[in-house]
Amino acid sequence: MILTRCLPLIWLSLLTVCAAGRTLHPLPVKGPKTVKLQLQTSRPYNIAHRGSNGEIPEETTAAYLKAIEEGTDFIETDILSSKDGVLICFHDCILDETTNVASHKEFADRKRTYDVQGFNITGFFTFDFTLKELKQLRIKQRYAFRDQQYNGMYPIITFEEFLTIARDAPRVVGIYPEIKNPVLMNQHVKWPGGKKFEDKVVETLKKYGYGGSYLSKKWLKKPLFIQSFAPTSLVYISNLTDSPKVLLIDDVTMPTQDTNQTYAEITSDAYFEYIKQYVVGIGPWKDTIVPVNNNYVLAPTDLVKRAHAHNLQVHPYTYRNEHEFLHYNFSQDPYKEYDYWINEIGVDGLFTDFTGSLHNFQEWTSPLPDTSKSPRQLLSQIASLVLPYAKA
């Protein structure tokens, strides 16, 4: 009996000795290919606004990888173009705010002034630089009160590089690209064959296998929403792809960049009835849903209710953890803000700079059903939740 009990320890000792003398390789295992964990569709979407840019400079590979690690459903990006027609991931049409372009003396003569949506904007515009030149620049954090240690570490990435990040993720991660400033891009960048900026965006998506109507089998394999503040661009690409589209909504007093209408006009019931032929949802600025006065949120408008009545999803922007952005009603607590918008306002997705906090809130308040088929999968899910804290 004693010898029997000791046998496992003896075998363990032998294995340890053997392992010290040579490299052990796992035996080959035959089995099906790994199936990625699918996108959840049972609770509001966690949309990583420019990646996890509350922690790492926006629109960088590191920011997107961090967002995936923290549990995002979608990684969001803004699409602009270089001078030579390469699609890049960058938010502003000028490079000044979030790159070190000013320190590159060789580019000092590139500063220009252009009309951008009725405003004269001066700076270093993306479309005045080739991709090779843009790759020499490095990204920096937009806000001074955020972590500055990553400034100067990461380059601008192309749209195709962004798509490979989603493709190579360990689970199904959706993408949420914005067709940014299409009027401006089409004015200053010319593509062969008379193609438009919008054509290039859709062509690139198709090249990487994106397509399919919302919640179709094809869509669920590679989830995608295409967003834009320009309604005519969304109508135009409806002839090119059946992928779901989202109309972004700015301050209601602002005019759209491609029509003579204000955003107040395009949030009317009559306009919703028209645009729902082309889009599956709207992406409003938060203050168009819930007005703010002296940093207090007021009574909500009926925008969400009316959008839902027209079978349109609502994905507001942008949710941020810092006190500079949190309204007093929420006592500097981002979880209170998430609770308000999800459970009282009833939104269908949230653009957030802090993917981790939104993911934690949803896991605590509306955990997904356990679809694990093995203890290994369950341990992997637990590890993904614990990892951010282990690194802290």
Swiss-Prot record:
Its main location: secreted. Expressed in roots, rosette and cauline leaves, stems, flowers and siliques. Pfam families: GDPD. It catalyses: a sn-glycero-3-phosphodiester + H2O = an alcohol + sn-glycerol 3-phosphate + H(+). Its EC number is 3.1.4.46. One of its GO terms (biological process) is lipid metabolic process. Keywords: Cell wall, Glycerol metabolism, Glycoprotein, Hydrolase, Secreted, Signal, Vacuole. Residues 44-362 form the GP-PDE domain. One of its GO terms (molecular function) is glycerophosphodiester phosphodiesterase activity. Glycans are attached at N120, N239, N260, N329. CDD domains: GDPD_ScGlpQ1_like. Induction: By phosphate starvation. Residues 1-21 form the signal peptide. It is found in: Secreted, Cell wall; Vacuole. GO terms for cellular component: cytosol; extracellular region; plant-type vacuole. Belongs to the glycerophosphoryl diester phosphodiesterase family. This is Glycerophosphodiester phosphodiesterase GDPD5. It comes from Arabidopsis thaliana (Mouse-ear cress).
